[in-house]
Amino acid sequence: IKYVAEPIGVVLGLLPITNPTSTALFKSIVGAKTRNAMIFRPSARAARCASRAIEILQAAGEEVGLPPNTLQVIPDPTLDVSQYLFHHSGVNFIWTTGGPKAVRATLEAGKPCLCVGPGNAPVYVHRSADLRMAVVDILISKTFDASVICPAEQTCVIDAPVYDELLAEFDRMGAQLLTDAEVAKLCEHIIADDGSIELIALGQSCLNLAGIAGIEVRPDAKVLLAPLPSDLEQLAAHPLLQEKLMPVLGVVRSPSLEHGIDACALVTEHEGLGHTSAVYTRDEAVSDRFAQTIQTGRILVNAPTAVGALGGIYNSMTPTFSLGCGTWGGSMTTDNINYRNLLNVKAVSYRQAPPQWFRVPADTYFNSGSLDALRQLHIRQALVVTDPICEDIGMVDQLRRYLGDAAVHVFSEVEPEPREEQVRAGVDALRRFEPDAVIAIGGGSVMDAGKAMRLFYESPELRMRELALPFLDARKRVAQYPEQEHTIKLIAVPTTAGTGSEVSPAAVLTVGDRKVTLVDYSLLPDVAIIEPTLTASMPRQVTADSGVDALTHALEAGVSIFASPYTDAFAMQAVNMILTNLPRAFEDGSDMEARTAMANAATIAGLAFSNAFVGVCHALAHAVGARFHVSHGRANGIFLPHVLRYNASLPSKFMPAPSYTAYVAPEKYAQIGWVFGLGGKSEEQRRQRLFARVDELLDAVEIPRSLAEVGVPEAEYEAALPELARAALMDPSIRTNPRIPMVIELLDLLRAGYAGRPA
């Protein structure tokens, strides 16, 4: 789809009280990209934060060519100023986000305008719906942005046959059902005399709302469910039928499809026309009927309204922070407003679960003697990338015996946690020698460096900072990796049994004082050679650290939101092999049977995490490792027991993922315990026995159980906690964890890693 837009001129932007900075930033970016000047009128209650946000953006824009004064704020709160601007001949367009009064004033100005009014989003759960998915989606949506985002669900209309089952699932996932008396007390304290919601209630937590209303709720309550009458006349008169920008969700029992759709229509008629609605059903006829009846610009089918309406995650709608409500809501468009179109359009968007993948190197050779495969590759000139230790102990000379008459050049400057400068030096070496193959022999750092060297050699225009930008889906991101065929072959030969880098599309590098992770299948080696004899010289500590790294890969891939039957098979096998063979390899480095099993297990775990990816344990290990120089495998081992128990508990926030329709991490841990014959009559027992087995392994291979044990200074660590939490939060590994780690939870995990063993 191609959209063409021309500058309008001077745009007057009205900002709401509930989203003053995000709306200001979004409108500023759209205005700047379409070469429009923006004048903003913020809410009087949010003028300072909006003004500061726009000031920062204007300054940043000027550094790259934005004309001065393109983005301006007039914070004077008086209505006379607004009226003056509404009718000023120099204002070409008005873009309003706000309540009914702001929309009416905009429409009365007599200028071209876009109005985004209040939302009052209904969601209809049909008896054919996937109830577990519906509950997780609604909780994701209703708790998004402190519950103040206007497309979030406000009233849930539930088919009577599944009403009790759905409420039970809500309760299990952390919502609390209020009694009629509690609903009455809540209304008494949060509804103003004119029937509107008191400002003090907006964006409050469940506990704070309970305190305001004088009711009791459990400490972990995510959303309060308020039963509303089924009778449509009584429902229309209820004060909680309106938009509730707080974690309060009305629930209505519906006796029929007709009643359910009528109830949803009634919700939209209470200042929600044109905005957003959702329906959960497996019956396309039901979603079609819903779409034909409900007058909203966004109709989400089997997707959460808040995250889904914003576009780009659960569907292919245009990403936005400004939602058109069409003529129903006093606007000129129903689009997700960005830079285009003057039409009212109903966008019926179905949840999209994109196809998954399983991508591996073209050839993988394993077991003793696999280095002989180098003879079959017909290499004329090779650059061997390695580290000083591997070169000193003769591993490069060992390679030469299999390369025949090939010219061999050696780049041995790679250090642990390779820095960008080392990668650039390697690129210079590639330019000097112009080989037809790069052979990266060493640990994970060497192989990661080799991947990055080939990438920047073949595509010198790429920039590390852009390639490392965060993303949710590798197919929908800002940074573009090259798609052309490689000009040189990359051969990965691991000398440790742990990283799995030989089969992974990731490269972890150090840029400045932080770790960055490049992830793309263009980084995948062409050939992986797993020669177990190369691991025989690993010291005990390296054997333990790298083996625990592989175990973490397998366990995190097993519960990733991208896990699949393909990756599960590899993850399960890797866990089994590591639990069985790592203690043997640790105790007796000459035990080649155990060494071979561990070399293969590390690669098998690599095949799992290369396609399912990892989670919060790796994010924490990357952050702590970069800051305090703790080895990656050791840091993983310290955090792993805490992360296992964290992921097995009820999430405070679910990870949005179209293919991940129910929270199954606890079940999968129990399944792993059952498959390995650890016993247990219940899922909880099987889970706990798996966790105990992991603890036993960590003790057996002498992994320190706390950061204090490895010598991290307590005062320095405590001072670094905010920085570490931020680094972990920005780490790409975190985006495939089965639950969203909140900052406070990351801090808890970081403190637990310092304190030691879980209780």
Spans of features found by a protein language model:
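ALDH superfamily catalytic-core signature
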Residues: L25, V30-T34, V103-Q234
